[in-house]
Amino acid sequence: MTRNLVRFPVQLALAAVLLAAPALAQQPGLTLPPDGDNQLASVTQGIGLVRVTIDYNSPDVHGPTGEDRRGKIWGTPVAHYGMANLGFGTCGDQCPWRGGANENTVFTTSHDVKIQGQPLPAGSYGLLFLAGPEEWTVIFSKNHTSWGSYFYDAKEDALRVKAKPEKSAYSEWLTYEFIDRKPDRATVALQWEDLQVPFTIAVDNIADLYLDQVRRELRSSPGFNWQNWNAAAQYALQNKKNLEEALGWAEEASTSSFNGQENFATLATLADLQAANGKAEDARKTMDRAVSHPTAGPIDIHRYGRQLQAQGKNEEAMRVFELNAKKHPNVWPVHVGLARGNAALGRTKEALAEARLALAQAPDDNNRQGIQALIKELEAAGGSSQ
């Protein structure tokens, strides 16, 4: 009887411990400083609508205990060359370097991109490296959730590309820096100690991405005004993309009773897109309406005349310059247009007279110098210097 009484409390205590174990396991951990003084860091770069982010832990040249590791980083256990056996995990002697510290270094792109010219789909990837004195291999692994590179598996590679290490300014902390930026590409470099390893990230279809976004926006509140329809049409025209669709946008901007407004800007865009779609006669008629429209200012008409001159249509250009003079007499840059129009038709004396009138109206030094140069050319061509 006594033996059973002793056993019963022991059994109860053991059961209590077993029941408590899951609850203890579910307790949250503490928030403490990062291991080894490796700072958590992140960098994001926009390439048009594309967003590229690298999340990483950043070790420093002076190690956790303060020792100076300068000259002892590359090709050592700190940042080993090639594959190595890290003594832990499942990668054996085929473990790349994680390009940072602690957790996996993660490369995320919102859209498909090209790395060093090779395609990489949108998504998140473990960013790993096979370092070397002359050449590196940059690995994008589909596994971005494992700790470090301890569980690396080459079968999970999404992409491998080559990169060249370069000497660089000293960097105490391992850093990922976007060192070159263009509208459709950027170069990111891993920088640490006296070395950097750059690789390019490019977006082939920047204009297509913007046009996809524009299509969505025109179906919402941005589509409630003519300015956005006109801007969308202009963007497609400038990039020579979806010109037939853009013509529809231009028509919406200039004619729609709900969204549109007929003015010089919308008619000029419509004319440009009619021309781009092979409708030359429609474009000419539309542009005639544009320059005759009450909203057509003297600079608008002058620019159209200069555009015609650039196309070799000097007689048409002269008619436009004369229309400008009729609509906006003695206003800048009407006399400039008449000077250039007459000069293109060989009427040197008339051109010189208009140029002198334009010189008196020049609004700034740049325009004044341009007209003075034109006057000298006309005088040398046989006009009077009086």
Question: Which ranges hold each PLM region?
Answer:
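N-terminal secretory signal peptides that target proteins for export/translocation
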Residues: 1-8
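Bacterial N-terminal signal peptides
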Residues: 9-21
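Boundary at the C-terminal end of the N-terminal hydrophobic targeting segment
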Residues: 23-26
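Extended, well-structured beta-strand/loop surface patches
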Residues: 55-122, 128-228
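A conserved position within tetratricopeptide repeats
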Residues: 214-221, 254, 258, 291-292, ...
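Alpha-helical adaptor scaffolds
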Residues: 227-252, 257-258, 262-334, 340
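Short coil/turn linking the two alpha-helices of tandem helical-hairpin repeats
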Residues: 238-241, 276-278, 346, 366, ...
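Terminal, low-structured helical/coil segments at or just beyond the last alpha-helical repeat
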Residues: 298, 352-386
